[in-house]
Every structure is written in structure tokens, then in C-alpha cells.
Amino acid sequence: GTIPCGESCVYIPCITSALGCSCKKKVCYKN
């Protein structure tokens, strides 16, 4: 929840979710 994964999730889910990233406030974050 603190580290940006450099990916947005406005229209599609986080592809980086495979790396443990999750969507928060239209941006993918890790931890």
C-alpha cells in the first residue's frame, strides 16, 4: 500500500497484482 508499482488501474485491473500489487486510488501499490 505504500510503494507505487508504476501502473494505473482506472480501466483495467493491476497486471502487477502478480507481483503483490493492489489497486488503491486508481493506482497500483505494493504493501
Curated annotation (Swiss-Prot):
PTM comment text: This is a cyclic peptide.
Organism field: Melicytus dentatus (Tree violet)
Name the record gives this protein: Cyclotide mden-M
Lineage: Eukaryota, Viridiplantae, Streptophyta, Embryophyta, Tracheophyta
InterPro entries the UniProt entry points to: Cyclotide, Cyclotide_bracelet_CS, Cyclotide_sf
Keywords in alphabetical order: Disulfide bond, Plant defense
Assigned protein family: Belongs to the cyclotide family. Bracelet subfamily.
Domain notes: The presence of a 'disulfide through disulfide knot' structurally defines this protein as a knottin.
Function comment: Probably participates in a plant defense mechanism.
Cross-link (Cyclopeptide (Gly-Asn)): 1-31
Highest taxon in the source lineage: Eukaryota
Any one Gene Ontology BP term: defense response
Disulfide bonds listed in the record: 5-21, 9-23, 14-28
Pfam family, one: Cyclotide
